[in-house]
C-alpha cells in the first residue's frame, strides 16, 4: 500500500484526497462486507493493517502542510484486569485508527485504577473495554464503578463502550456502560453515532 500511496502522491494527488476518497472509502467497503458476512476477521485485520501502514506515510505529510489529521475523537482502550487476550482488542484498535480516531492502547490485564489514570491523563471522548473470558466480566463493572467514583462521567461527556465474546447489550446496560459493540466494525459505528449527538 505504501508504494501505491507514494505513486498517487508522486502523480499529484492531494494527501487528504488519498485519505478521504481512497483509504476511508475502502474501509467503508470493508465494514459493509464484514457486516454482511462477506468478509471475515482475518481479512478485516489485514485491511486495517494496510490502512495503518498508509496512515504512517500520510500523517507526516499532512502535518507538514499544517493539515493535521482531523480526528473524529480520542479513545482509551484496554482489556480488563485478569484478561490477557489481545487479538480482539487489537482488531478494535486498528478499526478505530482506520476510522479516524486517536487511540491510546493500555494493553491487556488493565486494572480499574489504570483506566482511571489514563482518563485523567488523556481526557478521551470514549473508554473502550474488552473481555474474552466470562470470569473477567466483573472487572468491567469494577472499572466503570472506579471511573464513576472518580467523577469522570459526571458531565456526561465521557462515554464507555464494552465488548468481547461473552458481552451482550443487556450486560453492558446492566453494568452501566453507555455503548456496546458486538464486533470491531460495529464498535466504531456506535461510537461515531454517539459522539455526533
Language model feature labels by segment:
Residues 31, 74-79, 129-130:
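Short, hydrophobic beta-strand segments
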Residues 92-99, 104-177, 190-192:
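Cofactor-cradling patches in redox/metallo enzymes
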Residues 184-196:
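Two-component system phosphotransfer/interaction surface
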Residues 178-184:
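Short acidic-hydrophobic, aromatic-tinged amphipathic segments that line or gate anion-handling sites
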Residues 1-67:
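Long amphipathic alpha-helical segments
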Residues 63-80:
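Glycine/charge-rich, flexible interdomain linkers and switch-proximal surface loops
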Residues 68, 88-90, 97:
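Cytosolic, long alpha-helical scaffolding segments
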Amino acid at each position: 500500500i505504501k508504494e501505491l500511496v507514494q505513486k498517487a502522491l508522486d502523480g499529484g494527488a492531494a494527501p487528504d484526497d488519498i485519505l478521504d476518497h481512497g483509504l476511508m472509502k475502502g474501509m467503508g467497503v470493508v465494514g459493509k462486507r464484514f457486516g454482511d458476512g462477506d468478509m471475515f476477521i482475518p481479512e478485516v485485520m489485514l485491511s486495517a493493517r494496510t490502512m495503518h501502514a498508509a496512515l504512517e506515510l500520510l500523517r507526516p505529510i499532512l502535518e507538514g502542510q499544517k493539515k493535521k489529521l482531523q480526528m473524529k475523537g480520542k479513545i482509551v482502550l484496554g482489556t480488563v484486569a485478569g484478561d490477557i487476550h489481545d487479538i480482539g482488542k487489537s482488531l478494535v484498535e486498528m478499526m478505530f485508527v482506520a476510522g479516524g480516531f486517536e487511540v491510546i492502547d493500555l494493553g491487556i490485564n488493565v486494572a480499574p485504577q489504570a483506566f482511571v489514570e489514563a482518563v485523567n491523563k488523556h481526557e478521551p471522548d470514549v473508554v473502550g473495554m474488552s473481555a474474552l473470558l466470562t470470569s473477567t466480566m466483573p472487572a468491567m463493572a469494577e472499572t466503570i464503578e472506579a471511573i464513576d467514583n472518580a467523577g469522570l462521567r459526571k458531565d456526561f461527556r465521557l462515554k464507555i463502550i464494552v465488548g468481547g465474546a461473552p458481552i451482550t447489550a443487556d450486560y453492558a446496560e446492566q453494568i452501566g456502560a453507555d455503548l456496546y459493540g458486538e464486533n470491531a466494525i460495529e464498535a466504531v459505528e456506535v461510537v461515531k453515532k454517539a459522539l455526533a449527538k
